[in-house]
UniProtKB/Swiss-Prot annotation:
Alphabetical list of Gene3D superfamilies matching this protein: RNA Polymerase Primary Sigma Factor, Sigma-70 factor, region 1.1, Winged helix-like DNA-binding domain superfamily/Winged helix DNA-binding domain
Protein name, UniProt field: RNA polymerase sigma factor SigA
Gene Ontology BP terms: DNA-templated transcription initiation
Region (Sigma-70 factor domain-3): 214-290
Gene: sigA
Comp. bias regions, Acidic residues: 76-85
The organism of origin for this protein: Streptococcus pneumoniae serotype 4 (strain ATCC BAA-334 / TIGR4)
């Protein structure tokens, strides 16, 4: 187990370093992946598939040496089956008016037959702008179908669709029908890459290192697999066993993966309140305490004003009433150039005066509270 743990850790470190080195460029070639990871760690087919998924989840596009989508990735690409449900309420995304209007608008565009798709692709290669627009519009619902998979990752549904549409336009520009892939399969790759990269770059308010993002994505995948296998949410111990790490490490990753909640999140059925309205500000003083303190200070100043100037100043210095710093009898004696015993006598006399009911009555409410 220890040896296996070490091997897994070494592999994860290398994957994290590979992702870190390719994150800014946003792409990695098949040859680079083979040389750095597949061959050194002798990965089998399942290992390669998992590796490619981790790299793509980090927002890195996998290409051939010419910059086109990797044939290995395209062959494994799961093409969504489109239906009218993609344009109505089957998504867990909150469908508000702008989303509903957009879905209604693209729903009237008919899907293309294989022959129409081929004709349009050839026309696009020939520079036909109208064909380019028609090919893109006919696949807008494909973007919606893919975007639905990424709801809840930190970006609004419409933003996911917008990023996916940008990927769709790249697919239209770069598609080569002679390679033998359907346009929808080719476009799925570009759409998914555009969305996953946008999520990695934009979604989180609190920035998480790239290597941790891909670790979180792997954990989430294993969590979902275990949920399907067990029929219930897996425990950290079960996830840890599957991922060859400690339960404490799993808990740490789950904690990091938590999404921050906006203080502007609406609360209540009418959305007239926000989460921030119910969270106490521990830095700003409570309004009640602030008001009480101000009134107490005013009352205390009025009472001290009934003493002689020397008595008042002695009490202010002794108890730090002005600056919060209490002073010894000796310190106060130096200020007035008298002995500490004389200061003690002045203090005692002043306190006796303050205990008189006529003076102490205004402060009793504060003392009782």
């Amino acid at each position: 187990m220890a040896t296996k743990q070490k091997e897994v850790t070494t592999f994860d470190v290398q994957v994290a370093e590979f992702i870190r080195n390719h994150k800014q460029k946003g792409t990695a070639t098949d040859d680079e992946i083979n040389a750095s990871l597949v061959i050194p760690f002798t990965l089998d087919a399942d290992g390669i598939e998992d590796l490619l998924q981790r790299i793509q989840d980090a927002g890195i596009s996998i290409t051939d040496n010419e910059g086109n989508p990797s044939a290995r990735v395209l062959s494994n690409e799961e093409e969504p089956e489109l239906s009218d449900e993609d344009l109505i309420g089957s998504t867990s995304a909150k469908v508000n008016d702008p989303v509903r209007m957009y879905l209604k608008e693209i729903g009237v565009v008919p899907l293309l037959t294989n022959e129409e798709e081929k004709e349009l692709a050839l026309a696009v290669e020939a520079g036909d702008i109208e064909a380019k627009q028609r090919l893109a519009e006919a696949n807008l619902r494909l973007v919606v179908s893919i975007a639905k998979r990424y709801v809840g990752r930190g970006m609004q549904f419409l933003d996911l669709i917008q990023e996916g549409n940008m990927g769709l336009m790249k697919a239209v520009d770069k598609f080569d029908y002679s390679k033998g892939f359907k346009f929808s399969t080719y476009a799925t790759w570009w759409i998914r890459q555009a969305i996953t990269r946008a999520i990695a770059d934009q979604a989180r308010t609190i920035r998480i290192p790239v290597h941790m993002v891909e670790t979180i994505n792997k954990l989430v995948r294993e969590q979902r697999n275990l949920l399907q296998e067990l029929g219930q949410d897996p425990t950290p111990e079960q996830i840890a066993e599957r991922m060859d790490m400690t339960p404490d490490k799993v808990r740490e990753i789950l904690k990091i993966a938590q999404e921050p909640v906006s203080l502007e999140t609406p609360i209540g059925e009418e959305d007239d309140s926000h989460l921030g309205d119910f969270i106490e500000d521990e830095v700003i003083e409570n309004p009640v305490d602030y008001t009480t303190r101000i009134v107490l200070r005013e009352q205390l100043d009025e009472i001290l004003d009934t003493l002689t100037d020397r008595e008042e100043n002695v009490l202010r210095l002794r108890f730090g009433l002005d600056d919060g710093k209490m002073r010894t009898l000796e310190d106060v004696g130096k200020v007035f150039n008298v002995t500490r015993e004389r200061i003690r006598q002045i203090e005692a006399k002043a306190l006796r005066k303050l205990r008189q009911p006529s003076r102490s009555k205004p402060l009793r409410d504060f003392i009782e509270d």
